[in-house]
Structure formats: structure tokens, C-alpha cells
Amino acid sequence: MQLIQELSQARDRGLYQEVGKLTRELHNAIVDFQIDPHSPHAQEMSQIADATDRLSYVVEMTEKAANRTMDLVEQSAPLVNQLGDDSRELHQEWQRFMRREIDADGFRELAKRIEQFLVRSGENAGQLSSQLNDILLAQDYQDLTGQVIKRVTKLVTEVESNLVKLVWMAGQVDRYAGIEHDHVSMRHQAALERSAKGEGPQVAAEKREDVVSGQDDVDDLLSSLGF
């Protein structure tokens, strides 16, 4: 009995240390979230220290780029449609001319329309070129997005790996101690927890005493626990 109690205490201490270590590593990774200094938005991003805020910033940039792109496409579509309509009309008139169905006055009118079409086409082409260039520039957020998402993916992978090690360690201690768990009940409880609605983001967290309100509070809590 004493051996089982000692093993249980050792397990609890080990789990406590591993959870604290994992939390400290995760906290440090979130705070020290470095971005490539050559990124177009590196200077602006350097003012944002928290990874969560940086992800929110990326979402905001993505939304702005999407809106900008859609606006430019909406501005470009009428120009393209006009060029298509004018070219089809002129093509029909040119076919009539080739069949000698247009007299001299009609040909002079057609020549005038062709000249106007060429001038208008040049102007529209210049405007379309400018708008396409703006669309291209609006996509520069992708470099930053890729960096942040890759860092977050790496962070999540590391956390998952550490959690797997933690569960494995707990299982080994339980096996040596001869402790058996009701896995059916545990799976049922896990399913209930997954279906239950979470508390969600903390609203007015600064007015509550049971939650931490920022990375500084997390750091203070970990330090007070010896991690």
C-alpha cells in the first residue's frame, strides 16, 4: 500500500512538473513569436508581441486584401464587358462591309467608330493594367500569413507531441502501480465534454478574479508556481 501511495505521489509530482514545463514552453513560444524582418509588414508586426493578436492581425489583413481585390475586380469588369460588346458590334459591321453591304457614308461612319474604339481600348487597357497591378500588390499579405500559420502549426505540433508524452508517462506510472481506469466511462465523459458548449472568450476579463487577462498575468502565475 505504501509503495502504491509513493508511486501515486511520484506520478502527481511528475505530471505537475511536466504540465508546468509544457505551459512555460507554450507561453514562451507565444510571447517570442518572431517574424522574418524582411517581410513587407515586419515593422508593423514588431509592435505586436502576442501571437494571438498577430493571428488576428493576419485575419484583418486578409479581409482587407479580399475586399480590395473584389473592389478592383468590380471596377475592371465593366471595362472588359464594354470592350467585348464594342468589338462584337464592330466585327458585325466589318463583316457587312466585307460583303459590300455598306455604302460610302456607312463606311465613313464605321471608320469613325473604329477610331473611337481604338482610342477607348487604349485608355481601358491602361486602366485595367493599373488595376491588375493593384490586385497583385494587395496579395503581399500572403508572405506574412504563411510565416504566421507555419509558426502556429509548428507550435501546435510541439504541444501535441508534449501532451502525448505526458499521457504516455501517466499511463506508465499507472501500469506500474496497478491502477486501472474505466475507459468506457472516460470516453463517455469526454464525449459529453465535447458536446457541451464552452465558456468562450472572456468578456470584461479585467473585472473577473478567476481568469488571467494577459500574457503578463500568465508569466506571473507560472513564475509563482516555480516554472
Curated annotation (Swiss-Prot):
Compartments where located: Cytoplasm
Pfam families given in the database record: CheZ
Disordered: region residues: 194-217
A Gene Ontology biological process term: bacterial-type flagellum-dependent swarming motility
InterPro entries named among the record's database cross-references: Chemotax_Pase_CheZ (IPR007439), CheZ_family_phosphatases (IPR050992)
Coiled coil ranges: none
GO cellular component, one term: cytoplasm
Keyword Cytoplasm listed: yes
Keyword Hydrolase attributed: yes
Enzyme Commission code(s) on record: 3.1.3.-
Disulphide-bonded residues: none
Keyword line: Chemotaxis, Cytoplasm, Flagellar rotation, Hydrolase, Protein phosphatase
A molecular-function term among this protein's GO annotations: phosphoprotein phosphatase activity
Record site: Enhances dephosphorylation of CheY-P: 147
Assembly: Homodimer.
Record function comment: Plays an important role in bacterial chemotaxis signal transduction pathway by accelerating the dephosphorylation of phosphorylated CheY (CheY-P).
Family assignment from sequence similarity: Belongs to the CheZ family.
Protein name per UniProt: Protein phosphatase CheZ
Native species: Pseudomonas aeruginosa (strain ATCC 15692 / DSM 22644 / CIP 104116 / JCM 14847 / LMG 12228 / 1C / PRS 101 / PAO1)
Gene from which this protein is expressed: cheZ
